[in-house]
Swiss-Prot record:
Main location: secreted
Entry similarity comment: Belongs to the polysaccharide monooxygenase AA9 family.
Broad enzyme group: oxidoreductase
Protein function: Lytic polysaccharide monooxygenase (LPMO) that depolymerizes crystalline and amorphous polysaccharides via the oxidation of scissile alpha- or beta-(1-4)-glycosidic bonds, yielding C1 and C4 oxidation products. Catalysis by LPMOs requires the reduction of the active-site copper from Cu(II) to Cu(I) by a reducing agent and H(2)O(2) or O(2) as a cosubstrate.
Protein's recorded name: AA9 family lytic polysaccharide monooxygenase G
Glycosites: N155, N243
First and last residue of the signal peptide: 1-18
Disulfide bridges in this chain: C73-C195
Application in biotechnology: Lignocellulose is the most abundant polymeric composite on Earth and is a recalcitrant but promising renewable substrate for industrial biotechnology applications. Together with cellobiose dehydrogenases (CDHs) an enzymatic system capable of oxidative cellulose cleavage is formed, which increases the efficiency of cellulases and put LPMOs at focus of biofuel research.
Keywords, comma-separated and alphabetical: Carbohydrate metabolism, Cellulose degradation, Copper, Disulfide bond, Glycoprotein, Metal-binding, Monooxygenase, Oxidoreductase, Polysaccharide degradation, Secreted, Signal
Induction line: Expression is slowly increased in cellulose-inducible conditions (in Avicel- and wheat bran-containing complex medium).
Binding annotation for O2: H181, Q190
Amino acid sequence: MSFSKLTAFASMVAAVSAHGYVSGIVAGGTYYQGWLVSNAYQTPQPDSIGWADQNLDLGFTAPSAYATGDIICAKEATNAALSAKIAAGDTIDFQWTVWPESHHGPVITYLANCNGDCATVDKTTLEFFKIDEGGLIDDATVPGTWASDKMIANNNTWTATIPSDIAPGNYVVRHEIIALHSAGSEDGAQNYPQCINLEISGSGTLAPEGTLGEALYTPTDPGILVNIYAALDYTIPGPAMYNASGAGAATGAASASATSAAVVATSAAASSVVAATSAAVSSVAVSSAAGAVVSTTASPTTMITSVAPAATSAAASDDDETCDA
C-alpha cells in the first residue's frame, strides 16, 4: 500500500471509527475472513467471501435509496469471488468490528439462491427470504433494549441458523442492522447491509420464494419510519420469516405482541446456539496470502472473539457526526 493510500485510509478510519461492518464469520465452526475496508486500498484487491463496496466511510443506505441497488449489499457493492462452506442446519456467526450503542435497531438476516455462480450473479435478480430477525426485546425503558444491543453484548456477534430443509447450492446471505436513532423523521433510518457468499450443502429440497432486494422495504414502513424515543409496539420490517410450512412469523400485519414474542424467541435461540456450538476465533491464524480465503477451525471456548481488535463499548457509544448528515 502506498504512503498516500495509507494516509487516506488512516484518516478515513479515524473519522468513522464509531461505525462497523462484518469483518468475518464463523460458519459451522470454521472462521472465514470477510471483505475488509482496507482491501479497497490494495492493488490488486484480495479475493474474499464478502462483497466489496464503495461505502469506505462506513456510512449507511438511506430509505430514499431503497429502490436502488445500494440497499442490496451496500453502496455500489460488487460480487465476492469466494464462498464460505456451511451445511444446512448449521449456525453462522456474523462478527461486526464495532457498533455504536446509540444506534438501536433490528438485526435481520436473509438468504438468496444464486441459481449458479454467486461470483457472477446480477445482484438485482437475487430474491431474498428472511431466515432470522431480532427487534425490540424489552421496552421497559426508553428507547428500550434492541437486537443491536444484544449483538453488542455478545462481543459484536450475531448468530443465525441456516434452515435445514433448503436445497443445497450457492447462496448470498444478506445480514444487516437498521439503526433507528434518527428514524422519527422521514428518510432518517439507516440501513447497514452486508453480503457474503455461501456454499450450502445438505439434502433439503425446498426453494423458498423471495423478494427482490430493491423491494424489501419502503420508506414509510412502520418499522422504518418510527420514533423509538416514545412508547411503541415495534414491527420488524421486511417480508415474513421463512419456515418449512411456508407460513410467516412476525409479518408486517402481525400483532405487536406476536412480534415481540418472535423477537425474544429468536434472540434466545441465537444465544443458546452460541453457547452450544462454543465456536470462537480468538486464536485464529489468518493467512496472509492474497486472494486466498481464510478457513480455520475455531478453537472451543465459550465466547466468540473478533479477529479484528474490538473497540470498547464506551467508544461505540459515541455517535459519529457524519452518520446523521
